């Protein structure tokens, strides 16, 4: 069993671990486009919860810690992998709602719910990515049937690492670049940081270091275009566009999501009671924003070519 304090500290530890090694994760980034920002986006997403988590008292419940983290990550989510990361922690919030402490089975269910939410939110789920890594980790957690949290999380990390190392076999662009999936590597750094606290250790300290790549990444990063992994002319929707919709009363973004899917790709939309975080790769960001404003006022714009 873990307390709210332990869960709070574990999430902080995971956030620090990905922040410390974000540059190395950026260098692995070749899918869906080789824009070299996956580690940074994931770090900023989970890092958005740090101020609120650090302010929580040691007496907090697991429900309070998970809800605070999930809410902050939804609003701060950046990039495709960042939005998926926020969905994983939203699963924690839903599974742990109303609970003071959490059993191992609760954490397994939380991870499973997060993965299910992520698959539903992604327009076209692609295997060999963060989705595969977290799905197989969650399946192993559910199958473990252990009451021991450290043992459960060790199973999560072991299954996730195995899945990560297999990603080049599922996604040809990764094998061509000689790397594992950047999003999968990023979430494993988060899980490993959490494991240190679940095992009774201290929170991972914040200090950026070079992470040891799981496969040779010499072809990744600045060399991917020269390697012809993805030519510029092959990218039809060249603008990564992201924004928050602060919804009008009674507004539902279901139709907005359909519009984004019809006019772009890499669409991920996550919705809370009063806000929706929308991510899309498109050739016309202005058209996306013009449609979105019909559902509420917009903030947190990010448009990158």
Predicted regions and their residues:
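N-terminal loops that bind phosphate or other acidic moieties
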Residues: 1-305
């Amino acid at each position: 069993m873990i307390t709210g304090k332990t869960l709070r500290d574990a999430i902080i530890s995971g956030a620090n671990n990905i922040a410390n090694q974000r540059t190395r994760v950026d260098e692995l980034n070749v899918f869906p486009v080789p824009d070299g920002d996956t580690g940074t986006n994931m770090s900023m997403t989970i890092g958005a919860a740090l101020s609120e988590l650090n302010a929580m008292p040691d007496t907090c419940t697991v429900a309070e810690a998970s809800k605070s983290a999930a809410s902050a990550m939804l609003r701060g989510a950046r990039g495709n992998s960042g939005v998926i990361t926020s969905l994983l922690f939203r699963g924690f919030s839903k599974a742990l709602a109303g609970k003071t402490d959490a059993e191992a089975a609760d954490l397994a269910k939380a991870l499973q719910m997060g993965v299910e939410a992520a698959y539903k939110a992604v327009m076209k789920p692609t295997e060999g990515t963060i989705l595969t890594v977290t799905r197989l980790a969650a399946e192993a957690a559910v199958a473990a049937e252990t009451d021991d949290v450290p043992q459960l999380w060790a199973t999560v990390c072991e299954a996730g690492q195995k899945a990560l190392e297999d990603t080049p076999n599922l996604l040809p662009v990764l094998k061509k670049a000689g790397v594992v999936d950047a999003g999968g590597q990023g979430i494993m750094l988060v899980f490993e940081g959490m494991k240190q606290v679940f095992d009774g250790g201290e929170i991972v300290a914040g200090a950026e270091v070079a992470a040891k790549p799981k496969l040779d990444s010499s072809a990744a990063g600045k060399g991917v275009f020269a390697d012809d992994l993805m030519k510029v002319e092959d990218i039809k929707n060249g603008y990564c566009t992201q924004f928050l919709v602060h919804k009008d009363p009674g507004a539902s973004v279901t139709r907005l999501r359909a519009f984004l899917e019809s006019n772009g790709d890499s669409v991920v939309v996550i919705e809370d009671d009063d806000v929706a975080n929308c991510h899309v790769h498109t050739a016309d960001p202005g058209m996306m924003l013009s449609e979105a404003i019909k559902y509420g006022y917009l903030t947190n714009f990010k448009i990158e070519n």
